[in-house]
């Protein structure tokens, strides 16, 4: 218990980083040591002396100064220019040009080789949606009702401005740009 408290004091005074405290705990506890093992009291003495020296010195010393440890941490945000240089710069990290473009046999637009033409896929999905849409089947009771009775019995919903704006998808959804036709 004593060594645990002592380790926290060391971390507080920046003599030993907090990640190194874990190996200090078994050193002070004799019950955790192997019977033939030497007592390691000299380490505790050295750490106590170091702690007392820091109390004597009024200067706040950093554990990492002149210790040969360099902390590699970015100090500033990477600029837009540096990002572009990495992205488009020389080497294997450079963006590659797409050279494997072919002509779509059905519509004649550019497409990547060994893939489907996105324009044709969009057309097929549109056809599937229109043909598979189910028509609403009205019950027989509603067929005989007049228009006034239907309005009284089933007032329906009134769309708010928000729902009307949501239904107008052309304003906020970006459509896929059609590729150029190959000449």
UniProtKB/Swiss-Prot annotation:
Zn(2+) binds at residues 104, 107, 117, 120. One of its GO terms (biological process) is mitochondrial translation. The keyword Coiled coil does not apply. Keywords: Mitochondrion, Ribonucleoprotein, Ribosomal protein, Transit peptide. Its main location: mitochondrion. GO terms for molecular function: structural constituent of ribosome; zinc ion binding. Residues 1-71 form a transit peptide. InterPro entries: Mitoribosomal_protein_bL32 (IPR051991), Ribosomal_bL32 (IPR002677), Ribosomal_zn-bd (IPR011332). One of its GO terms (cellular component) is mitochondrial large ribosomal subunit. Pfam families: Ribosomal_L32p (PF01783). SUPFAM superfamilies: Zn-binding ribosomal proteins (SSF57829). It comes from the Eukaryota. MRPL32 precursor is processed by the m-AAA protease (composed of YTA12/RCA1 and YTA10/AFG3), which cleaves the N-terminal transit peptide. Cleavage by the m-AAA protease takes place prior to assembly into the large subunit, an essential step for mitochondrial ribosome (mitoribosome) assembly. Proper processing by the m-AAA protease is dependent on the zinc-binding region within the tightly folded C-terminal domain of MRPL32: zinc-dependent folding halts degradation initiated from the N-terminus and triggers the release of mature MRPL32. It is found in: Mitochondrion. Present with 1700 molecules/cell in log phase SD medium. Component of the mitochondrial large ribosomal subunit (mt-LSU). Mature yeast 74S mitochondrial ribosomes consist of a small (37S) and a large (54S) subunit. The 37S small subunit contains a 15S ribosomal RNA (15S mt-rRNA) and 34 different proteins. The 54S large subunit contains a 21S rRNA (21S mt-rRNA) and 46 different proteins. bL32m has a zinc binding site. Belongs to the bacterial ribosomal protein bL32 family. Component of the mitochondrial ribosome (mitoribosome), a dedicated translation machinery responsible for the synthesis of mitochondrial genome-encoded proteins, including at least some of the essential transmembrane subunits of the mitochondrial respiratory chain. The mitoribosomes are attached to the mitochondrial inner membrane and translation products are cotranslationally integrated into the membrane. This is Large ribosomal subunit protein bL32m. It comes from Saccharomyces cerevisiae (strain ATCC 204508 / S288c) (Baker's yeast).
């Amino acid at each position: 218990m004593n060594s645990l408290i002592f380790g926290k004091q060391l971390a507080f005074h920046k003599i030993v980083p907090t990640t190194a405290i874990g190996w200090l705990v078994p050193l002070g506890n004799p019950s955790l040591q192997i019977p033939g093992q030497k007592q390691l009291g000299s380490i505790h003495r050295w750490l106590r002396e170091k702690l007392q020296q820091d109390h004597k010195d009024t200067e706040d010393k950093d554990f990492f100064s002149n210790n040969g440890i360099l902390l590699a941490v970015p100090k500033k945000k990477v600029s837009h220019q540096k990002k572009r240089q990495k992205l488009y710069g020389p080497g294997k990290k450079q963006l590659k040009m797409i050279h494997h473009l072919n002509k779509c046999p059905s519509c004649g637009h550019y497409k990547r080789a060994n893939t489907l033409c996105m324009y044709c896929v969009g057309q097929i999905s549109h056809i599937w949606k229109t043909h598979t849409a189910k028509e609403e089947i009205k019950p027989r009771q509603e067929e005989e009702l007049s228009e006034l009775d239907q309005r009284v019995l089933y007032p329906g919903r009134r769309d708010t401005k928000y729902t009307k704006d949501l239904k107008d998808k052309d304003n906020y959804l970006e459509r896929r740009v059609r590729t150029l036709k190959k000449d």
